[in-house]
């Protein structure tokens, strides 16, 4: 026979922000524990193709900027490659639990990144929103300044120094 006593339990209530933060941390930890942290088959990941050999600089910038982020794998071009030796053939990294990939494109295309596709971040608080907005817009372009546009407390849209588009929101 098993007897469980619950006489000394405290009834604590967590607000929505605390629950959301715990879920985010849990999801991030689960992603970090995947075998070798490489993308699984059929998993959808963002792949950033850089045409100006900025893949490594961009990846390092993002990993340093976002919490719970790390570089997982980097495969470089060799001497016989179509681009300068040592440039990124493909790399995998995580940003707060989300997997991304990038490369330095060997052929130069007549296209680049477009703000029609952007990374969207629901920020935890105003401090995080302003910090990310400030860092991402540094040497980039502000598409929509931080403001209340009627659909959330505060929203901003930037194109960073590497041409990648970011929408930052605070509910």
PLM features: what roles do these ranges have?
Residues 79-80, 105-107:
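Short beta-turn/strand-loop junction motif enriched in small, turn-promoting residues
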Residues 2-5:
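C-terminal motif of bacterial Sec signal peptides marking the signal peptidase cleavage site
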Residues 38, 83-89, 111-113:
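A generic structural micro-feature
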Residues 7-17:
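Bacterial Sec signal peptide processing site at the extreme N-terminus
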Residues 17-44, 48-50, 72, 94, ...:
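Vicinal oxygen chelate
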Residues 25, 49-97:
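Core segments of cupin and vicinal oxygen chelate
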Residues 89, 98-106, 112, 149:
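Conserved, structured core segments of small domains
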Residues 43, 88, 116:
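Conserved catalytic motifs of the protein kinase core domain
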């Amino acid at each position: 026979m098993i007897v469980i006593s619950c006489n000394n339990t405290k009834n604590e209530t967590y607000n929505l922000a605390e629950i959301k933060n715990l879920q985010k941390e849990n999801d991030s930890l689960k992603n970090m524990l995947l075998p070798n942290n490489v993308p699984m088959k059929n998993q959808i990941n963002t792949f950033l193709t850089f045409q100006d050999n900025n893949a490594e600089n961009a990846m390092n910038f993002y990993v340093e900027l976002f919490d719970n982020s790390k570089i997982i794998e980097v495969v470089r071009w060799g001497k016989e490659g179509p681009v300068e030796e040592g440039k990124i053939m493909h790399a995998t990294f995580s940003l707060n639990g989300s997997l991304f990939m990038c490369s330095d494109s060997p052929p130069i295309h007549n296209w680049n990144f477009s703000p029609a596709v952007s990374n969207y971040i629901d920020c935890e608080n105003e401090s995080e929103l302003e910090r990310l907005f400030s860092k991402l817009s540094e040497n980039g372009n502000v598409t929509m300044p931080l403001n209340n546009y009627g659909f959330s407390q505060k929203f901003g849209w930037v194109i960073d120094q590497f041409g990648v588009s970011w929408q930052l929101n605070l509910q």
